[in-house]
Amino acid sequence: MNTTSPAAPSSSGVSFISLLVIIVLSVALAVGLPGNSFVVWSILAKLRKRSVTALMVLHLALADLAVLLTAPFFLYSVAQGTWTFGLSSCRLFHYVCGVSMYASVLLIMTMSLDRSLAVALPFVSQKLRTKAVAWRVLAGIWVMSVLLATPVLLYRTVHLGLNNRSLTCFLKYPSERHRAFHLFFEVITGFLLPFLVVVASYCDIGRRLRARRFRRSRRTGRLVALIILAFAAFWLPYHVVNLAEGFRAAAGKALGSGPVGRRLLLARHVLITLAFLSSSVNPLLYACAGGGLLRSAGVGFIAKLLEGTGSETSSSRRKGTLAQTLRGTPASPEPDPAESLTASTNPLE
């Protein structure tokens, strides 16, 4: 991520910011670490047939876990008021956060495109939506995330803080032009383009469903809204600050210079922690989407929520029906088209 470290605030007058960072990071760890571990366990241990969507949810949870596993190091640094883990750890931990950020954003974007394709071109979606294609897409997402996050390795360094006593894991650029480029690059690739794709995909889904007058389940509509709102709520403020800093850097203004620069720097220290909080929210969204499944299936509700999802299951059902027809065996009745399309618009189906 193109950020200063959560441990960066070290001058007097920012103790409140440090306390807020500690509280938010602690909440993210307390909720996200067991929550995402539960999602991974549910998919690997409880789900016998993993659909394409289940694989994406699994990788989303793994990306979130990777971020959360770095949180204790940042918590310790904030509490101590200095970075004590050296240059290699400074670069590694922030690089892991950057890779996970891109992976999470690209996975959410891919899931929204997958749902949009399933509604717009269902037969094409069935042909493309196979495990082999899914694994290639997932591999591509991780490779792209690794590449997009590489500027973190180039610009991260450890140096003395403003008080000349504490060490800070910080972004240091050769020039303000480099800083402006990195800021704009991260805003565009890490938020703007993926967010536009997510919004466009769900707008297209809604438009097609309204045009065809299909019913939409309350659970589906609620989950779609929650995913988009959570995506925007956690990442929009951070990238707005990045955008403002990018314009300041392009104008040749140094980081933290002037009253506006100092406010933006303090705002970033808080908004960085929202990235950690965003890594803990997805299990809560699944619990909201589960509804009655949480009460009826207990700890297996994630597996029930993802069980038989995607077009792989429906394709198998159609192949079985065709075989029955060729043998002269009566086929089981097809579900109502409206119900099929309604189900296919669920991002977790």
Curated annotation (Swiss-Prot):
Q: Which InterPro entries match?
A: Formyl_rcpt-rel, GPCR_Rhodpsn, GPCR_Rhodpsn_7TM, Leukotriene_B4_rcpt, Leukotriene_B4_typ-1_rcpt
Gene Ontology biological-process entries: neuropeptide signaling pathway
Q: How is it modified after translation?
A: Phosphorylated by GRK6 upon leukotriene B4 binding; which promotes desensitization.
Q: Does the keyword Glycoprotein apply?
A: yes
Short name of any one Pfam family annotated for the protein: 7tm_1
Please list every transmembrane segment annotated in the UniProt record, as residue ranges: 20-42, 55-75, 92-113, 139-159, 180-200, 223-243, 270-290
**Family under the similarity heading:** Belongs to the G-protein coupled receptor 1 family.
Q: Which protein is depicted?
A: Leukotriene B4 receptor 1
Q: Which organism is it from?
A: Bos taurus (Bovine)
